From Swiss-Prot:
Residues 162-186 are annotated as: Disordered. The gene is tatB. It is a single-pass membrane protein. This is Sec-independent protein translocase protein TatB. One of its GO terms (cellular component) is TAT protein transport complex.
């Protein structure tokens, strides 16, 4: 394809190893191979569509020639085949138009989906910030007695969670506080 010999390929690999390093070289090779596969797939798709279009054009040309030769002068068998060719040409034309329409709508649909996803991603963030604002407002409205009651409730809940998580032996063996550790060092 590119007329690259083995020695040139080895030279490219060594240069890639020096430039990219051993960690990034395999990733770069995979990326390039994915690009090549995608390009080959697109080229094959275009080639198939061109072949179908050429077949359609040939069928239309043969139909026009047959019409110009006056269909009434032809034998009944030949007129049947001409009608079949017309039907096939119309069918192929409809299929190609459908594929073209589907390709156009899928791209437009994908663009709409991406825009909707971006808008939906922004909405939950706004909703969270509104909830946080409401929470801070409700905390600011609380009286000091409410806060102390809330703190004791939170302490009880925290102790129950900690006691269920840690076995009783771990609770008794607690690290020394700063005042105890300074007394032992003195």
């Amino acid at each position: 394809m590119f007329d690259i010999g083995f020695s040139e390929l080895i030279l490219l690999m060594v240069l890639g190893l020096v430039v990219l390093g051993p960690k990034r070289l395999p990733i770069a090779i995979r990326t390039v191979m994915d690009w090549v596969k995608t390009i080959r797939g697109l080229a094959a798709n275009v080639q198939n569509e061109l072949k179908q279009e050429l077949k359609l054009q040939e069928l239309q040309d043969s139909i026009k020639k047959a019409e110009s030769l006056n269909l009434q002068a032809l034998s009944p068998e030949l007129s049947k085949t001409v009608e079949e060719l017309k039907a096939q040409a119309d069918k192929m034309k409809a299929e190609l138009e459908d594929k073209a329409a589907q390709a156009g709508t899928t791209v437009e649909d994908q663009i709409k989906e991406i825009k909707n996803a971006a808008e939906n991603a922004e909405k939950p963030q706004n909703a969270i910030s509104v909830e946080e604002a409401a929470e801070t407002l409700s905390e600011a409205e609380k009286t000091p007695t409410d806060l102390t009651a809330l703190e004791t409730h939170e302490k009880v809940e925290l102790n129950t969670h900690l006691s269920s998580y840690y076995p009783p032996d771990d609770i008794e063996i607690a690290p020394a506080s700063k005042s105890q550790s300074s007394k032992t060092k003195s």
